[in-house]
Amino acid sequence: MESVGDVLKDHPSRFQYQDLVQQIVKDPDVAAFIQKESLSQEELNRSISKFNQYITERDKFLRGDTDYIARGYKPILVMNHGYADVSYEETPELIAAEKEVAIKNRLRLINLPASLTKASLAQVELDDLGRLPVFEKFFTFVEQYPEVRKGLYLYGDFGVGKSFMVAALAHDLSEKRGVSSTLLHYPSFVIDVKNAIGDGNVKNLVDEIKQAEVLILDDIGAEQSTPWVRDEVLQVILQYRMQEDLPTFFTSNFNFEDLEKHFAKGKNGNDETWEARRVMERIRYLAEETRLEGENRR
C-alpha cells in the first residue's frame, strides 16, 4: 500500500496535510464508503492514500482521459483486510459489448452476409401485417425452447425478408437461450460439397452441418441439385436431425409442392418423384410450412 507521505509529498506542512485529508474524506463517494463500512479512525488513517488514488482514478475515468488504462472498467472502493482499497468493475457499456460478442459468437454464418448477425426480432418491422404470423411463431419458439423442437419452413416471394427473419430468430435464440445456430446458404453449400469430392472431405462437411444445435438452410431449392446431393447429402443431414430431434429451419422461394417437383428432376430428365417424396417427408417432419407475406424489400 502507498504511504501517505508518498501521496502527499507535495504537501509537507502539517496544516496542508490535514487540509488535504479533509478534502479527501469529504468527497461524496469516499464519505459514503466510510459511512457504509463504519470505518474506525485507525482504518480511516490507513486508507487515506487509497482514497486519494480512488479519487484520481475516478476523475480520469469520468473525464475519459486518454491515460486512463483500465478501459471499460470503473474504479470502486472495497475493503481489504482493515483498510480501503481500489478495485475495478466492468461498466454497463463493456458488459453490453461483451454480451453482444458472445451472442455473435454463437451465430455461425456460412456464405451469408455478416450483416445478418445484427438482425433481431425486435428489429422486425410489423407495419406489414403479413409478417405478423411468422413473427409470432418465431417469438413463441424462442420463448418455449427447448420444449418446442419443430422448426419452420419459411417460403415466399423473392426479397420479402426470409433470410432476415431466420437470422433474427437465431440472434434471439443466442441472446435469450444461449443457443448456437448455423445458418448456411444452401446453394453455396451444395457447391462446396461437390468441390470436396476430390479431397474426400464430403463426410466431414456433412457431419459438421448435420450436428448443429440449430440448423437453418437458407434458399433451399435454388441449388443445382443432383440425385447424389439429394440422397447422399441432404437426406443424410435431415435423417440425422430427425433422429436426434434437432431444430431445423428452411427458407425457400418454393412451397412444399414446388420443392418436391424440384427434387424429382432426375438425371437425364428422369422422373424421381418417389425419391423426392422421401426427402420431403423428412422436411415436413422437421418443419411447418409457413408463407411469409410482404413486399420486396430489396
Predicted feature residues:
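Intrinsically disordered, low-complexity N-terminal extensions of AAA+/P-loop NTPases
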Residues: 1-48
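Conserved nucleotide-sensing/catalytic segment adjacent to the nucleotide-binding pocket
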Residues: 194-246
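Structural recognition of the conserved hydrophobic beta-strand(s) that form the central parallel beta-sheet
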Residues: 183, 216-218, 247-253
